[in-house]
Amino acid sequence: MFTACGSNSSDKSDNATQESTSEYVSEDIKVAALKGPTAIGMVKLMSDNEDNKTANNYTFQIEAAADAFTADLIKGDVQIAAMPCNAAATLYNKSNGKVSVVGINTLGVLYILDNKGEVTNVSDLKGRTIYTTGKGTTPEYTLRYLLNTNGIDPDKDVHIEFKSEASEAATMLASSDSGAVAMLPQPYVTTVMAANSDVRIALDVTKEWE
């Protein structure tokens, strides 16, 4: 995931030209992020903001999909957004550079889970249903790459079922008795494992990628 940063009319070079001795003027900044690990990385900022420990005043918009705030980011109604890297790249091009990538805030949070103990490598995914999220974004591209590099056709050898939220994919895995698997990010991995003792981490996507 990348953090894409946009600017509005108040974020102009005038502020940068002020003398360093001048008093800092607090600004109102709206931050948008996706549910799950993307937003969890902002918990301290959220807490500090509530306790009036931040230099600026922040408001937060947490959504299930980046589409819910991309238009506002381009318009400048949202100043900071955490979203998939491909979405950030698209916005950079659409906005002619007005929206730019400033950092990566999540790494190594994807795992493949099963509830039968039958999956020990990527090849074991062949013929299975895979529940996941992020159609058209980083999770889908990552999954397709891993399958292809292990000789599995993502469109023929497996059935990838995309859900709008990770919690839905977790529920489908927990209720499945057909050997289905799910690719989920933390903290949903921990949540589903705590709720169902049969569910385990079968593959660490980061290690498989490496």
Positions of predicted regions on the chain:
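A bilobed periplasmic-binding-protein/Venus flytrap-type ligand-binding module shared by bacterial periplasmic
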Residues: 44-46, 110-121, 210
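Short beta-strand-to-loop elements that line the ligand-binding cleft
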Residues: 56-65, 82, 154-165
